[in-house]
Every structure is written in structure tokens, then in C-alpha cells.
């Protein structure tokens, strides 16, 4: 069984993502019913990358989330600590500067980036607050943060249906399409244990970011948090 537990030991999380790398993008598309593409577009709009800006895309995986920044003329650095993900990404997008790095100890100097973003990865860092502080460290003063992460649906009846999907349907569907379906049991458990929108905004502020705010996507299944260095 290739999966991590909720204590999120880095070696377990790394092995889990190495195992799912080959079919990661396809599986995400199926499990989200295509919504992942909409969420990625929302991240790009929130970051609003300008030509020549330096953007860090942390937990970039295979680089699917990074390429749109390059398409807008930004200098994007996809960073991930799963070598399996990086290998798949480098094979598909050889022009991007894929970089191996731990979210709690980023291999970049202070104030390197104009904008930093992490999509569906903060939840997997062993210490999310440390991860947010590291992102703060490598961002220039006045730079911006965008976090796209699973959250808590705002409509109570829908929340009940969504939790049922997470805990029952999602792992079953993953068994049909993923190269490591047990990893998606961890996905469901980690989403259920993650803070709500207000809780994550408080964590962003505690890490030193200014004026954290968020907007909900897909009824709160996902929340897009923004803040300034």
C-alpha cells in the first residue's frame, strides 16, 4: 500500500506522490470532473503574472500548473519534493526549470520571487505554517501569495454529500484510474482534517503575510487565498 498518514511524514508523502506521478494529471481530471482546469485558471488570474516576473510554483508536481505562467511571459520555477513528479514533468515540459525542494526548507535566497503560489500542496507539508513562512521569506516585499487548496463547502446539505463522496466514492473511482489508488484514501482524509477558510486565513496571517483574503470556488470545495508580503 502506497499512502501517507495524517502525521504527514515527509518520506511517506514523497513515496506516495512518486507512486501516483505517472497518471497524476489524468486521475485529477477524472476525480474533479474537470473542475481542476477551472481552478488552475483561477490561480493564474489571481496571481496575474506580468512578463518578466519571477514566480515560484511550489508543489508544482508535473508542471501542469506552471506552464500557464510561462505562457504569460513570467519566469516560473516549478518546485516539488517528489522526484517522480519532477521526472514526469521534465519529460513533458523540458523547457521549464524543474527544481527539487522541501517546502519547509526552500532552496532559494530571500526575496527571490515577485509572486509565490501553491495549489493543493500546502495540506501535504508536514508543517504548513513553516511552509507559509518559507514562502514569505523567498518573496520580495510587496510580492504576493496565492494558495489554492481544498476547503469546506459553505452550503450545509452539499457539505454532507461532498464528505460522502470524499470518503466513499473518491477512493473507489481512484482504484479504476490511478497508478496508486490507496494514495487517494489519504487525500480524502487529509481534506476532511484541513482547516476551513477562516482557519487557513489565520494561518497565513500568522506566517507574516498581510491582508489575507479568500474566495470560494465550486461552492467552497476549493478556496483561493491571497495575501501580500
From Swiss-Prot:
The keyword S-adenosyl-L-methionine applies. GO terms for molecular function: demethylmenaquinone methyltransferase activity. SUPFAM superfamilies: S-adenosyl-L-methionine-dependent methyltransferases. Pathway: Quinol/quinone metabolism; menaquinone biosynthesis; menaquinol from 1,4-dihydroxy-2-naphthoate: step 2/2. InterPro entries: SAM-dependent_MTases_sf, UbiE/COQ5_MeTrFase, UbiE/COQ5_MeTrFase_CS. S-adenosyl-L-methionine binds at residues 62, 80, 102-103, 119. HAMAP family: MenG_UbiE_methyltr (MF_01813). This is Demethylmenaquinone methyltransferase. It comes from Nocardioides sp. (strain ATCC BAA-499 / JS614). The gene is menG.
Amino acid at each position: 500500500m502506497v499512502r501517507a498518514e495524517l502525521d504527514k511524514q515527509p518520506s511517506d508523502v514523497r513515496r506516495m506522490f512518486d507512486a501516483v506521478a505517472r497518471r497524476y494529471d489524468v486521475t485529477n481530471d477524472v476525480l474533479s470532473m474537470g473542475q481542476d482546469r477551472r481552478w488552475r485558471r483561477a490561480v493564474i488570474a489571481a496571481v496575474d503574472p506580468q512578463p518578466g516576473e519571477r514566480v515560484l510554483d511550489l508543489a508544482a508536481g508535473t508542471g501542469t500548473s506552471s506552464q500557464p505562467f510561462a505562457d504569460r511571459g513570467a519566469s516560473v520555477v516549478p518546485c516539488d519534493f517528489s522526484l517522480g513528479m519532477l521526472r514526469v514533468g521534465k519529460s513533458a515540459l523540458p523547457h521549464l526549470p524543474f527544481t527539487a525542494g522541501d517546502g519547509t526548507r526552500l532552496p532559494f535566497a530571500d526575496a527571490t520571487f515577485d509572486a509565490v503560489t501553491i495549489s493543493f500542496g500546502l495540506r501535504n507539508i508536514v508543517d504548513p505554517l513553516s511552509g507559509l513562512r518559507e514562502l514569505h521569506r523567498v518573496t520580495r516585499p510587496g510580492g504576493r501569495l496565492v494558495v489554492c487548496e481544498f476547503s469546506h463547502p459553505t452550503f450545509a446539505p452539499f457539505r454532507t454529500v461532498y464528505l460522502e463522496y470524499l470518503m466513499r466514492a473518491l477512493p473507489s473511482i481512484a482504484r479504476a484510474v490511478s497508478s496508486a489508488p490507496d494514495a487517494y484514501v489519504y487525500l480524502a482524509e487529509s481534506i476532511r482534517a484541513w482547516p476551513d477558510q477562516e482557519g487557513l486565513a489565520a494561518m497565513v496571517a500568522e506566517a507574516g503575510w498581510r491582508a489575507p483574503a479568500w474566495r470560494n470556488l465550486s461552492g467552497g470545495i476549493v478556496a483561493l487565498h491571497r495575501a501580500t508580503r
